[in-house]
Amino acid sequence: MTTELHDDASGRLIVGLDVPTIAEAEKVVEELGNAVSFYKIGYQLVFAGGLDFAKSLVAARKKVFLDMKLLDIDNTIAKGVENVAKMGVSMLTLHAYPKAMRAAVEAARGSDLCLLGVTVLTSMDNADLREAGYFDNAETLVLKRARQAHEAGMGGIVASAVEAQAIRQAVGPDMAIVTPGIRPAGSEKGDQKRVMTPADALRAGASHLIVARPIVGAPDRKAAALAILKEMRSIGRS
């Protein structure tokens, strides 16, 4: 299924709750208040009770991106996706392998769950791909997987904003392009290698931006989020 691409920046900013405990996640959400409506929950928080926390966010009318990067045999993927669809979360990731994506799309049919195919992690560059046994460079592999996700009927993909413009040209206007590795000007890259500022990512064609450390690690989290939202609104719909 496709997902609505929000014109309002608050629906396009996804804050990554990359924290070790539910208590810390609750503190982040409380501090951000009404400024942020969309949160990403990944492995770190899932293994600390994050699935129940995801349900509580949904009950509080927040949107949840469950970043599980699933990859397994078709039947296992399908059964897992069926249960995730019942949780009421908005987005779920799986690795962009054709058979897995097709199984997931069929399992999510009739629900509001937007399935996202993960192309190449933003922490990886061409040298990392060669070490892992891939012969394609990052952009070639990203575009190949983006096209496969589109053909499978996925709602969107996860990819670096560096490749967003080429992806948008390849898959058209309807798929979500969700971009991690977003760093405001002057921020440190951390362990990310293919990064971009919020404004540049939107200009390149990204539909949603994932921001974690620049907000969660800021002394004033709400001020950091509002600054990014202001930058996003200055660009408008890409």
UniProtKB/Swiss-Prot annotation:
Q: Name one GO cellular component term.
A: cytosol
Which EC number applies? 4.1.1.23
- Recorded metabolic or biological pathway in which this protein acts: Pyrimidine metabolism; UMP biosynthesis via de novo pathway; UMP from orotate: step 2/2
Query: Which residues catalyse the reaction?
Result: K69
The record ties this protein, via InterPro entries, to: Aldolase_TIM, OMPdecase, OMPdecase_AS, OMPdecase_bac, OMPdeCOase_dom, RibuloseP-bd_barrel
Q: Which GO terms describe its biological process?
A: 'de novo' pyrimidine nucleobase biosynthetic process; 'de novo' UMP biosynthetic process
Q: Name one GO molecular function term.
A: orotidine-5'-phosphate decarboxylase activity
Superkingdom, taxonomy of origin: Bacteria
Keyword line: Decarboxylase, Lyase, Pyrimidine biosynthesis
- CDD domains, A to Z: OMP_decarboxylase_like
What residues bind substrate, as annotated? Answer: 18, 40, 67-76, 122, 183, 192, 213
Q: Does Lyase show up as a keyword for this record?
A: yes
Where is coiled-coil annotated?
none
State the reactions this protein catalyses: orotidine 5'-phosphate + H(+) = UMP + CO2
Please report a single Pfam family linked to this protein.
Answer: OMPdecase
NCBIfam families the UniProt entry points to: PRK00230.1, pyrF
Recorded family membership: Belongs to the OMP decarboxylase family. Type 1 subfamily.
User: What does the UniProt function comment say about this protein?
Assistant: Catalyzes the decarboxylation of orotidine 5'-monophosphate (OMP) to uridine 5'-monophosphate (UMP).
Subunit arrangement? Homodimer.
Q: What is this protein called?
A: Orotidine 5'-phosphate decarboxylase
Q: Which organism is it from?
A: Brucella melitensis biotype 2 (strain ATCC 23457)
- Give the encoding gene's name: pyrF
